[in-house]
Amino acid sequence: MSQQHTLPVTLSPALSQELLKTVPPPVNTQQEQMKQPTPLPPPCQKMPVELPVEVPSKQEEKHMTAVKGLPEQECEQQQQEPQEQELQQQHWEQHEEYQKAENPEQQLKQEKAQRDPQLNKQLEEEKKLLDQQLDQELVKRDEQLGMKKEQLLELPEQQEGHLKHLEQREGQLELPEQQEGQLKHLEQQKGQLELPEQQEGQLELPEQQEGQLKHLEQQEGQLKHLEHQEGQLEVPEEQVGQLKYLEQQEGQLKHLDQQEKQPELPEQQVGQLKHLEQQEGQPKHLEQQKGQLEHLEEQEGQLKHLEQQEGQLEHLEHQEGQLGLPEQQVQQLKQLEKEEGQPKHLEEEEGQLKHLVQQEGQLEHLVQQEGQLEHLVQQEGQLEQQEGQVEHLEQQVEHLEQLGQLKHLEEQEGQLKHLEQQQGQLGVPEQVGQPKNLEQEEKQLELPEQQEGQLKHLEKQEAQLELPEQQVGQPKHLEQQEKQLEPPEQQDGQLKHLEQQEGQLKDLEQQKGQLEQPVFAPAPGQVQDIQSALPTKGEVLLPLEHQQQKQEVQWPPKHK
């Protein structure tokens, strides 16, 4: 019985420990055991199925007492049954542990299946939010860009008005003749203030000097007022930088507009434009260097002015030591020296304004050069179109030359037909061996309908090749434009090519004149001579003179 109910289940100890850790606490195992009872022998069916793992000794005694009347073999079987039940319980426990070890994977799968839709929903919501945020940011950026463009378009107008106002102020700052006279008067007064050596011992100033000092104070007030006006007129550095930046942006916008209007330029023009851009960049670099040099020159002028002021101060201190002037006059003299340095500052500002005017002139010159470039580009496009027409004409001429022989064959066919008609009228006896040869030659000379269509097409092309008077006058204009834009070697090659085309056209006209000449009817004795002159397969057509000579030599004798 024990061999029938035991099943071999082997699990590694490591797996069993891991599974026991992860698996939740087991459900009542006794209920599952009740569902699947083990079969027992008939005398022992009254025994309870539920047995603990460790059977106490008291139960064994009870079992022994309950089954006293049975034979010893049955009692031994009953004693072995608890052991079998214990083995079955161990087996069921192992089986349950194995099932529980498999269940976590299923639980994980179920949890994943439940979590996946939730995660997908969350991701979709987050994506929607991000899309909305991006759309809002794009709208904001577009609005900001539109505002900036409007501001940039409005700034030049404001700055133009500001520049006009500055120019008016500059006109006001130009000192009139009266102020120049006042400055000269001040210099004279300074000269008068330098007292001679005789007045060294005199400390008290006369009444005239006191009046002069009052006059100097009034002039100092006027100079301060002028300084205040100059301070208002000084353009801040930020506005200057904004003006330069706006000019650069305007230049870039013009350049982009021109690029959009212009077609794709050839490689040569692209190189020229790059070279021009480099040249345009060079003036800016030179302007920066000039500005630096001017700044250095201004600094040198300031240093020289300071040295002069130091020399004047030393001279004044020497005079003060001699004259013993009070401290108030010393301060007044220093203020006068400062006021004299202000006109130089105004002159420097005027020089900067002149420099800006020169830069504007240079920009206008560059704009004119760009317009010239556009005109050159248009001329080059016209030249390319005309060159394409010339190439098309060359191809047509070559095609005509190839098919010129077909016309010659047609003319020979016409002559043969005319000769055949004359033969029929004259009743010349036909030779016996000639009909087959004549039929072969006629088959060779019969042109298909395709050749006739080609001849018609050639006639149309010849009509197109007849250049009108306007096209005859165009090559001269083209030659002048090509001399301006192309190197001399290319011009020589194109002129030679045009001369060759003219020569080919003249040759075609001569051939037409020859073909239009009338065909004379031969005498009765010469009818068969012309038939023998027709070329067979492999022979080459010869001029008419050589053919006539061969006809006289190769004429076969008549059969009587």
UniProtKB/Swiss-Prot annotation:
Residues 76-91, 189-211, 321-334 have a biased composition (Low complexity). The keyword Repeat applies. GO terms for biological process: keratinization; keratinocyte differentiation; peptide cross-linking; response to UV-B. GO terms for cellular component: cornified envelope; cytoplasm. Substrate of transglutaminase. Specific glutamines or lysines are cross-linked to keratins, desmoplakin and to inter involucrin molecules. It is found in: Cytoplasm. Its main location: cytoplasm. Residues 92-115, 159-172, 212-231, 252-264, 274-320, 335-353, 404-420, 454-463, 476-486, 494-510 have a biased composition (Basic and acidic residues). Residues 1-15 have a biased composition (Polar residues). Keywords: Cytoplasm, Keratinization, Repeat. Keratinocytes of epidermis and other stratified squamous epithelia. It holds the Pfam family Involucrin_N. Part of the insoluble cornified cell envelope (CE) of stratified squamous epithelia. Belongs to the involucrin family. This is Involucrin. The gene is IVL.
